Amino acid sequence: MEKKSVPNSDKLSLIRVLRGIICLMVLVSTAFMMLIFWGFLSAVVLRLFSIRYSRKCVSFFFGSWLALWPFLFEKINKTKVIFSGDKVPCEDRVLLIANHRTEVDWMYFWDLALRKGQIGNIKYVLKSSLMKLPLFGWAFHLFEFIPVERRWEVDEANLRQIVSSFKDPRDALWLALFPEGTDYTEAKCQRSKKFAAENGLPILNNVLLPRTKGFVSCLQELSCSLDAVYDVTIGYKTRCPSFLDNVYGIEPSEVHIHIRRINLTQIPNQEKDINAWLMNTFQLKDQLLNDFYSNGHFPNEGTEKEFNTKKYLINCLAVIAFTTICTHLTFFSSMIWFRIYVSLACVYLTSATHFNLRSVPLVETAKNSLKLVNK
């Protein structure tokens, strides 16, 4: 099934277009104000004192903003998100691996994370080119998403360095990784099959061959502080949605998400064995998707309930109210200091994202140094 980057015109109407534009304007404007005010204060200023409490604040404030997306998908667009497989606990620190059907798969992780109270703690390994997106590049940087060039000789040291900073078991963590390295298309699948045939690897029809090095590195760095690995399989019954399909609410009508919770004791320790384990996992995923396309559903559906509409409607209204107040103070009030602050924050976030700069926890470092001296 090929990815289409244009919306399905058969279902597109003027009402959907207007609703989509309004929703997108709300999401972009709220993102800007949350990044400028709470993002700068919690991820930059507070980080000078404590990385741990900085991450807690980022998780809270941006979890509130990210919750707008599942609300858009499920309550406004009426997309049915159907979960199946293992019922997962709320408190797990996990590494998630998933197939990559289309450009918006990663957004549906938020629907599961919201139900588990982890939406502010989810991080992704993503293409470095996405860090250049206006506004959203700032968000990816402040959320501590991990950019990769998809060239291992360049990525290994950077990946291990960033992932190792997530080792503290006191910090909540959902680290998401797409081992295929790119989204699925028929053309890519044919190239994957050709490579598999030439190298004696399994022939997969519904997924691409996984790239193992990133997964191995993440697992090795975090194994002592993880509770589990979640093997997530995403299926769409009809057309794979594009970003614009999501915005206009025309696709998908249903998203099926199957979760297999894997204890770390079930995963080998040696790199060669981990590679084989991941390859076998994608063979199982390929068969699971084959059955899904035949039957129209995954086994053991209905493991998660709908989220509380009232609770997240109040959350949406609170985020919009905060944005309205900040917009007024910045652009329409006589307080010039707000405009100066916003300008400086924009300059800093642009520079920090481009050069990958982060605040050094000076106070925390000084305290640790004093402890060592006193010993």
UniProtKB/Swiss-Prot annotation:
The chain crosses the membrane at residues 21-41, 57-77, 312-332, 337-357. One of its GO terms (biological process) is CDP-diacylglycerol biosynthetic process. Its EC number is 2.3.1.51. The keyword Zinc does not apply. It comes from the Eukaryota. One of its GO terms (cellular component) is membrane. CDD domains: LPLAT_LCLAT1-like (cd07990). A motif (HXXXXD motif) lies at residues 100-105. Widely expressed at low level. Pfam families: Acyltransf_C, Acyltransferase. It catalyses: a 1-acyl-sn-glycero-3-phosphate + an acyl-CoA = a 1,2-diacyl-sn-glycero-3-phosphate + CoA. Keywords: Acyltransferase, Lipid biosynthesis, Lipid metabolism, Membrane, Phospholipid biosynthesis, Phospholipid metabolism, Transferase, Transmembrane, Transmembrane helix. Pathway: Phospholipid metabolism; CDP-diacylglycerol biosynthesis; CDP-diacylglycerol from sn-glycerol 3-phosphate: step 2/3. PANTHER family: 1-ACYL-SN-GLYCEROL-3-PHOSPHATE ACYLTRANSFERASE 5-RELATED (PTHR10983:SF74), 1-ACYLGLYCEROL-3-PHOSPHATE ACYLTRANSFERASE-RELATED (PTHR10983). Belongs to the 1-acyl-sn-glycerol-3-phosphate acyltransferase family. May convert lysophosphatidic acid (LPA) into phosphatidic acid by incorporating acyl moiety at the 2 position. Has no activity when expressed in bacteria or yeast. This is Probable 1-acyl-sn-glycerol-3-phosphate acyltransferase 5. It comes from Arabidopsis thaliana. The gene is LPAT5.
